[in-house]
Amino acid sequence: ALWKTLLKNVGKAAGKAALNAVTDMVNQ
């Protein structure tokens, strides 16, 4: 279903953003 693909993509993007935020915090 289209919404499942959409949900998966949103989850991937959110995970990547969270990972980047954590990396930024560690680097500061």
UniProtKB/Swiss-Prot annotation:
It is found in: Secreted. InterPro entries: Dermaseptin_dom. Pfam families: DD_K. Expressed by the skin glands. GO terms for cellular component: extracellular region. Has antibacterial activity against the Gram-positive bacteria S.aureus and E.faecalis, and the Gram-negative bacteria P.aeruginosa and E.coli. Has antiprotozoal activity against T.cruzi. Has antifungal activity against the yeasts C.tropicalis (MIC=10.9 uM), C.guilliermondii (MIC=21.8 uM), C.albicans (MIC=21.8 uM) and C.albicans ATCC 1023 (MIC=10.9 uM). Decreases viability of murine peritoneal cells. Fuses to, and disrupts liposomes. Belongs to the frog skin active peptide (FSAP) family. Dermaseptin subfamily. This is Dermaseptin-DI2.
